[in-house]
Amino acid sequence: MSINAVDSKKLVEALLGDLRLLSQEAKKKQNHVKESAETGVVRIRNISTASVGDTVLITNLRAACTELLHPLVLACETRHTRLVQIALQGIQRLVQHRILSGNGATIVTNELWALVEAECEELRVLQTVPPLVSSELIVTGNTLAKCVVMCFRLHFAKDPIVINAASAAVRQLVSTVFERVIQEDGIFSSELTVVNPSGGRPSPRAAPPTLRPCAADAYMLFKDLCLLINGEAPTWLVGIQEMTRTLGLELLESLLKGYPSVFIRHTEFGDLLKDDVCPLIIRLFSPNVKAMHINSQHPSSRISNASMSNYPPTVSHDRQSFPISMRLVRIVTLLVQFYQNILHTECEIFISTLLKFVDGDRKGWQRPLALESLHRIISSTDLVKWMTESFDCRPNSTHVLEQVAVELSVVVQQCLVCTTFSSDQDNELDRSQEDGGPGFLVKGLWVPYVEHLTSKKTILLDSLDRMDAVAISEGYVLSRCCVALCDLTQAVYAVIDRLCVLDENCEAGSSEENLRIAKVAYANTQPSILAAIGSLLAASTDEIVSDQLLCCLSTLISAGCRVGADQDLHRSVYVLAIMSLPSPSYLNQFAGIPPPSPVSKREVSISEQVFDLESWPSTAQVTATGPPCPCPVVSTDLWNKQVLLTSKNLQAARTFIASITTHIKELNGLWYLCMATCEHLSWLLAMRPTQIGQFERETRDDHSNGPTVVTNAALGDIGMLSSLMDKVAPAIAALPNEEFLLVVDALIRLSDESLAVAATGRDSSLFPLAVLYRVCSLSLSGINVFWAKVANHFIKVCNHTSVSMRDWAAVALTSLAKHAIKSKTSMDPKSQQEMVIASLLALCSIPHIQVRRRQLDCVMSLMQTDGSSLLSTSWPNVIQIISSIIDNDTGCELSLVRQGYLGLRLVSSDFLQSIPFDCISGLVEAISRYSKQNTDQNISLSALTLLWTISDFIYRKMESVGNDASEAVWMVLYTCLSESCVDTRFAVRKSACQTLLQTVTAHGHALRAPAWHHVIWQIIIPLLDKVRSQTRCASTEKSNGELIMHHSRDTEQKQWTETCIHTLSAISKIFNSQRKSLLALNDFGAVWEAFLGYLDWAACYENAELSLSAIRSYQEVLLGKISSQTLNVNSHEKSNGSESTLDTVAPELPQAQWVESWKVWLRISRGLARQGCAAVANSVNADTKSTSSTPRMNSSTSSLTSLAPGVYVPGPSHLTAILHIFPPLFDKVAKCITVDDLKYESLPAVLESMMNVPIPSEQAPFVLPSSTTHLTPTQEALLEAVKIVYVECTISGTTLRTAIPDQIRLLLKFASMATQRISPNKVAPGGQKSYRDYALTAIVPFSEYSLRIAIEFFTSTSQYPDVSNSLIAINIIKFLGEPLYMKYTCISASTWKLAASSLMSVLRTSIPYARQNPEVFRSLWSTICDTMERWLFTPNKSSRLAADERKRDELMECQAIEIIRNEMLAYASRLPQEDVQRLISLLHRGSISQIDSTDVLDSHTQRNELAKACFDALLMSTDGAQAGAEEDDHRGILGNVAVTSLLQRCTQVMADFCKDWSAAGDLRLPRSRILEIISALQAIDSLIARLARDPRMTELYSQLVSLFPSVVDVMPCCHADGQLEQQLIKTIKSYQTLFLLQNIPQSTV
């Protein structure tokens, strides 16, 4: 401490004044004092003069301290009062200005000790000692001890003034000693220096060597104080003879309270506490045997039984017990408050001792005294935290905090137990209640409440000046416990709050440990506090006291919320809840919410004391009465029971609502309990929610189960409760997401219960729905958290049977939706609008019309008011809401459908340009739904019109939105149209098909190739599937509807058939127009195959219209717009240099698809033919099948007069259409197919079967042949198909050449139709003319043309080995035998003539090749013989035939004989013998028997030319007789046989004629006989002429000579006929030539 200039000058002047005064007073008797004083004056003056500056002056004065003290000490030694006073004054100045040195301090101390011994100026000595000790650290050790001892001794002086001053001085000195320790620690703030002892054990009379001087002094002082209190002699304070125990305890208390840092910083002092103080306190607590037991429990106790027995007895034990006990309790309180960290075990013992005092109050003041101490302890947050950490958190330690709480609770319960109840108590109870004082009432026991009690304001602990305990008022203990419990609750909450505050620098492990400590503190105190508070609250009769207890309960709830103690918090909330309701069992009895079950023994008391009460004390005012809120989980009998609500219930209700509002974030799973309590409160107080979710007082309806009566006194509370309840919703709205959802769940659960009650027809509470609506309306900023769950619940309520609740929920949901759309939230506006509108969409599942109408009203309102603000993603949901009206569950109510369609039109008209393009797909789907609804067909048709309008809009938007977006919408549009194409209503289907075709036609080119993949597989193919399925399953029954329909559409079958026709036609056009895009598909092959499959099915379907349409679609999809009249038959011949016209017109198609199309063509053709054959089989007028080998007449040139019911026959138009496809199709696949496809079993068989399809009678009149070819279109198409195949087979290098014979066979089949025999009952198609006439115009031309083509094909390709080796020539010759046999019986004579010419062509072509391959064609010769025989000798004669015609026919026969003679007989050696013999026989027969008796012209009765030809052939064969050496013997034998046969025949004819002529007499023989003999004579004449040309035929010569007699025999008969006579004369004259032969060769025979 520095001294400024003014102070130093004043000090010098004061010292000089004191010395002068001392010199004056001592000059009479104390001369040595006078001299010394004068010397001091001189010394001071010299120092003052010599010192420059104040600092130097002070330093010099301190250096001369001893000299300055000398006169003052001498004055004190004189014991003269005045001199002593002056000297002590001077010493005080030196001490005050710190001029005194250490030696000077010792001198002063010794002199003061002497004065005390002399009892001189004791008061002034007491004034000097404290400054001396406290000024500087110059008084230490024994010097300091002397100072302290002096004050202690003066404390026991006789003068009261001295005693009081000494008492103050003692306290000051003791405090100064410990303050010096603090100063010393501050100076040496570094680590304490440990002084190693010199050796041996430290002396018990000295301080530990590790302490610094000041600390050592304090150590010795404190230790001696303990010794003095314990009645032992001090070791440092030598000279103290006596000291009262109360003073010692007070000094200990002051030191322990004032300087805790000293005891904590220095372990030596801590050891003093453990070794001296604590055992001392324990002994003083129990000076009897019990104290021995307690003392022995302390491990550090140094007090022995002997020391206890040696303690001098004081005054009466009972009298001195209270002041000492009171001070001991104060010290114990201090030890626990300040030294708990170093005295764990001791503090535990002290608290246990206090609890023992509380448990057993034998003197009346021990329990309140201990309660006051415990109250101070548990009011400290730090101490509560310490007890929790040190004891309760340790597993094997005593739970001190828990014991304290339990003991307080036990005291409360004991105080509320009434052991006896007398009339005096009854009177006192009445007086107390009349006085209106606060108190507690339990079962007739009245306990008053002492007000204004705090932990610091105590009665017994503050009685330091009293020897006896003051009188304790009744109810003090219970009141103290009540306040202590409240303070304990606050302390526990403070501890929890401190531990739960997150420290940014705190590690994770530390945070978890803090939370664990907080949980233990709460768990160990909550049950006891709750039990006590619950009991006190139940018994309280004062509003203020009840409010304090409710506040405590609320704090307990707050603490539980902070630590997350769910079970404990549950019990606390439950207690507060039942306090708010009419009875403790109300929740369990009327709400079905049982009290939480105790999980430990200490919790049982809660149930026993609070929950099990039948009713609350009846002192509170009744505010309301009525029935409880109905709950479905309890018996319905309880719904009509009357309950009472009191003012204390309302007070608790206010706290309850305020508490849950305050701690709303931590209630977690207790929200159901809280909301149920609020619901019952609102019900009991008739608080009804308004439409906006707020509460107000209303009167219950008359029809309810007993009205609720509310007193006027409760109206104010109801208003406050309404206000508090209204604040719950905003508080809930501010909750975090998870907690908010818990509240929502609880409200939904309560709402479900209300729904269950409403289902019984009873009035139910609207509280849950109101609060839920209110909460959600205030939480729209966090809509993403709750919306889904809340909306689902409202939707559930909307589906309830209660009309009012249903309507209320619908209004709530739609109102929330309207506000939610406009709310500003953290959500993405897109997601927000989607979520809100999705909830409106969920209402679509509600079948109630009113709910749906409110839904539509809401949507319409949104569009009208906020339509421009709707985001792109919201429009699809809006549209879907409108479209969802079309649903079976609602029965498609007409008003809803119309209202919904108005909304749809509003979107399409007002928002089509503004809504995002990606919403158009949803709009299209919505419109499609309305087009499918069955309620109003006009709306359906109008909806399809909207689709067409939207398609134009899409097309206009393509450039701005891009191909991807537009294609996506196109897909939806096409899908919807395709779905409408299979609508059950024909008008809708037709309109949809037209719209689909128009849309694709107008805008289909907008799609890119990838999009077509989706169109094909997801739209077109499924559409075709559905149409096919419906067409198959459609009913054939006529419609009985009200509308009059045309006969062509009067059945579902007919309607679906037309739909199928439209669909196939439309899709075919799509395939053609979009061929380029479709070809870009990777799976175009599969697409093509699938579509052709549908065409195949439709073409073969048993419906003429559908079949023909499918065939035309098939033609169109293959050939484009090319006409069937422009087909190029000879495409191969005209495609050498440039591409043909067909190729330029036909759509592009890969080769694989052409092959697939070829296969489909075959299948369709077979199917059509198969249907025609089936019709023939089922025909009721089928012709009898021919037994011959000729084909039947059932062909495309025949007809069916009648068909069996349901039998379908493809018409000529079907066959013609499919055949017109063949040429271009075959041109594409000719290079890819195999020869097996052209074999007779494949393509020719198909063509043949198609030719066999009959013509329906109704179509026959319209089948007209061509004016040029005389063929019907079908026949032309068939022959053109064959020609196409033939041309392909004749191309050089082709592999199909082996199929030529099969094509010829097919043509022969066609040609055979002209040889069929006509039955008498055969009717021409249409029945207009005879069948023969019909055949002449429709059958014969086709057959003859087929035959010509066949012969042409054969003659042109016979040089091919594949054709010649196939033996097709045999088939042709065999076939030609039939018309040649029929000859004049054929339908047309041109047929057999064509056959004859064809035969000759075939013979000319095939015989030369056959001669070269005799083995291969072995059967050819017999076939030729058969055919010739059938032709030349047919029994079928013409009835009328002109001579020239017969000559022409005979000429043809001669030509055939000529071919046989030149091609066969000329090479007879190469032919089989039997076939040659047969030929000779035929010639023989032809040469003599060719007579036609039916000829009217006698001059031409014989076929002379034929006979000549036969004779010439026979005669030519006779050349073999002269072959001899030149040719083989076989030929010679053949000539001899021929001649012999001829001559024998002539001899027999002449002999028979002569014989018959003689026998006939005058009768003339038949003309045939005359002609026969004429032929024989002619043959002889021919032989003679032959012999004349070749005289070497000796055998013939002999035979002719032998025949001459027979010729002569004819002469008598020649007069019968002139012609015969002339021929006979000619023959006889020929013999002249024979006889005149000059050189007759000799016969070798």
Curated annotation (Swiss-Prot):
InterPro entries: ARM-type_fold, DCB_dom, Mon2/Sec7/BIG1-like_HUS, Mon2_C. It holds the Pfam family DCB. The keyword Transport applies. Keywords: Protein transport, Transport. GO terms for biological process: protein transport. Belongs to the MON2 family. PANTHER family: GUANYL-NUCLEOTIDE EXCHANGE FACTOR, PROTEIN MON2 HOMOLOG. May be required for traffic between late Golgi and early endosomes. This is Protein MON2 homolog. The lineage of its organism: Eukaryota, Metazoa, Ecdysozoa, Nematoda, Chromadorea.
